[in-house]
């Protein structure tokens, strides 16, 4: 059996970090600041698309959007950790999986360095069996190649995938035996239900994940 996790919106709340970066650039360019509601609405498809969507809500000049998006990306990579915190129950659940000897993986569209920095800060005593990221040669989600690789390496038992967005669902479909979407993440319960996801895959707490 193996457990595979998304990072942002599933294990950690990175919105405060993202808003710090986004609003610094917006303020420097005399643009309206962003907030948590807007950030959740544009999150889930990677950093650059998030930054670009935030800027397109304010301006239409593509050159300026490209310039400011690049500035946001640089600022984020300088410090991807400050403000990011684990969701309640995440640390205990990961440690439980480690104690009972389960194989675990992280599949993230983040680069490996910022992802590792976040893990070291939020989960200092836990180590994933494997981490999959784009700069390690893996296609970003919704590609399921990384998930298929994990399944080939650890074929025994059920494969469980835990994410929080439609991107995660697409990644896990037809590969994972069980899929859970966290309602505390970027989409929330109401949005996930309105998007057509069945309630029996939605979880409000890590304790609802079957073993």
Task: Show the residue positions of the predicted features.
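Charge-rich, acidic-biased intrinsically disordered regions
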Residues: 94-101, 108
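Conserved SAM-binding loop
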Residues: 4, 11, 86, 104-107, ...
């Amino acid at each position: 059996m193996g457990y595979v996790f998304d990072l942002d919106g599933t294990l950690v709340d990175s919105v405060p970090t993202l808003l710090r970066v986004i609003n610094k650039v917006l303020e420097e360019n005399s643009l309206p600041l962003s907030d948590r509601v807007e950030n959740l609405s544009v999150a889930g498809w990677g950093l650059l698309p998030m930054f670009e969507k935030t800027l397109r809500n304010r301006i239409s000049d593509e050159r300026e959007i490209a310039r400011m998006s690049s500035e946001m990306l640089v600022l984020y990579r300088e410090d991807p950790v400050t403000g990011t915190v684990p969701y309640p129950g995440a640390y205990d659940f990961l440690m439980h999986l480690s104690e009972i000897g389960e194989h675990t993986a992280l599949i993230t569209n983040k680069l490996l360095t910022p992802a590792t920095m976040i893990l070291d800060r939020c989960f200092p005593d836990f180590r994933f069996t494997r981490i999959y990221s784009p700069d390690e040669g893996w296609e970003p989600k919704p590609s399921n190649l990384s998930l298929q690789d994990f399944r080939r390496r650890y074929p025994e038992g059920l494969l469980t995938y835990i994410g929080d967005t439609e991107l995660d669902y697409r990644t896990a479909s037809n590969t994972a035996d069980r899929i859970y979407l966290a309602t505390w993440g970027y989409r929330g319960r109401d949005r996930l239900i309105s998007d057509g996801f069945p309630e029996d895959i939605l979880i409000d707490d890590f304790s609802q994940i079957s073993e």
